[in-house]
């Protein structure tokens, strides 16, 4: 039987438009001010040094780093330093009530149902763990983090790498064949399946005609107890 479900966020639990039309512009508008006001103290100075390490430029100036961050945002680069910085900026927005984390209406009832079945539920997203926690603790449905057993970001590996899913399995202590991954992205599901996981693809729009994964349009259609392991 399935013992753990790991779900993506963007396009899976959450409308992609919330991320691209609300979160990303909010962080972009405030990024330079956030960096310049805190460049001499933690956590900003540590994040800037992390970024210098990412781009292999230990002497990069703050101006150069800000330019790099804007470039990474334009490219939707999965930079750990950028994701952490965005998370700090989004925290202000969540706490101030500027927005709440969007969840599709079918998500929380399914999380409650699976939790009642003693299935552990984890989040795996390219967004930083702190940013993930903010979304689920300040969601449209309130704080639902009590339903979640843990969070993973790219520190366990990229989402299209097979090794990332093996790492998550080891960290949770759940064998790969008892892990179920939910995502809207075929290539991520391909990597999870190659690692030995079960997979279900969330299709919130048009079907993916190239996918070989089971496709559903709602969490209501996912019944882990019926998935053979």
From Swiss-Prot:
**Co-factor binding details:** Binds 1 Mg(2+) ion per subunit.
Q: One biological process GO term for this chain?
A: L-methionine salvage from methylthioadenosine
Keyword annotations for this protein, in alphabetical order, are: Amino-acid biosynthesis, Hydrolase, Magnesium, Metal-binding, Methionine biosynthesis
* Annotated region (Disordered), positions in chain: 208-229
The biased composition feature labelled Polar residues covers: 208-218
Which pathway does the database say it acts in? Amino-acid biosynthesis; L-methionine biosynthesis via salvage pathway; L-methionine from S-methyl-5-thio-alpha-D-ribose 1-phosphate: step 3/6; Amino-acid biosynthesis; L-methionine biosynthesis via salvage pathway; L-methionine from S-methyl-5-thio-alpha-D-ribose 1-phosphate: step 4/6
Quote one Gene Ontology molecular function term.
acireductone synthase activity
Q: Name one Pfam family in it.
A: Hydrolase
Q: Where is the composition biased (Basic and acidic residues)?
A: 220-229
Query: What's the Enzyme Commission number for this chain?
Result: 3.1.3.77
Annotated Gene3D superfamilies: 1.10.720.60, HAD superfamily/HAD-like
Cofactor(s), names only, from the UniProt record: Mg(2+)
Record's keyword annotation contains Mitochondrion: no
State the reactions this protein catalyses. 5-methylsulfanyl-2,3-dioxopentyl phosphate + H2O = 1,2-dihydroxy-5-(methylsulfanyl)pent-1-en-3-one + phosphate
This protein's record includes keyword Hydrolase: yes
Q: Which CDD domains match?
A: HAD_EP
Instruction: State the family named in the UniProt similarity comment for this chain.
Output: Belongs to the HAD-like hydrolase superfamily. MasA/MtnC family.
Quote the function comment for this protein: Bifunctional enzyme that catalyzes the enolization of 2,3-diketo-5-methylthiopentyl-1-phosphate (DK-MTP-1-P) into the intermediate 2-hydroxy-3-keto-5-methylthiopentenyl-1-phosphate (HK-MTPenyl-1-P), which is then dephosphorylated to form the acireductone 1,2-dihydroxy-3-keto-5-methylthiopentene (DHK-MTPene).
Q: How does it assemble?
A: Monomer.
Q: By what name is this protein known?
A: Enolase-phosphatase E1
The organism's taxonomy opens as: Bacteria, Pseudomonadati, Pseudomonadota, Gammaproteobacteria, Enterobacterales
